[in-house]
């Protein structure tokens, strides 16, 4: 499992109709970008949230965004950092980190995972 605290740095229109891209700056120099549809867009810029990536279904409420899918990509960038991608059945989550989710042995390629972004109480 991986979790942390983030601040939403931007919410931008995506390439497809009714799609937004939420960008977050998180603990430990982690950056996360994820797609969300207009109907599910429940977040605001500068909002503080927590994220969870887990093989087990986490607890969440109707105020949170939670979906499941597969970790399908990890690639190392020229600067040595990693990009991991999770497909939530079409919606994409990109995790930019120093060590990578697979490289650091937290997850394996094609693991079924839950991705949740939870509002602070």
Swiss-Prot record:
GO terms for biological process: DNA-templated transcription. It is an enzyme of class 2 (transferase). It catalyses: RNA(n) + a ribonucleoside 5'-triphosphate = RNA(n+1) + diphosphate. Keywords: Cytoplasm, DNA-directed RNA polymerase, Nucleotidyltransferase, Phosphoprotein, Transcription, Transferase. Its EC number is 2.7.7.6. DNA-dependent RNA polymerase (RNAP) catalyzes the transcription of DNA into RNA using the four ribonucleoside triphosphates as substrates. Belongs to the archaeal Rpo8 RNA polymerase subunit family. This is DNA-directed RNA polymerase subunit Rpo8. It comes from Sulfolobus acidocaldarius (strain ATCC 33909 / DSM 639 / JCM 8929 / NBRC 15157 / NCIMB 11770).
């Amino acid at each position: 499992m991986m979790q942390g605290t983030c601040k939403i740095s931007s919410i931008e229109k995506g390439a497809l109709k009714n799609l937004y891209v939420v960008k977050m700056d998180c603990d430990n120099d982690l950056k996360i970008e994820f797609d969300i549809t207009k109907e599910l867009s429940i977040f605001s810029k500068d909002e503080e949230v927590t994220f969870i990536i887990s093989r087990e279904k986490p607890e969440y409420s109707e105020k949170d965004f939670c979906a499941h899918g597969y970790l399908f990509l990890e690639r190392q960038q020229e600067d040595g950092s990693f990009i991991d991608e999770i497909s939530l059945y079409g919606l994409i989550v990109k995790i930019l980190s120093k060590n990578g989710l697979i490289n650091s042995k937290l997850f394996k390629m094609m693991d079924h995972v839950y991705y949740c972004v939870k509002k602070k109480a």
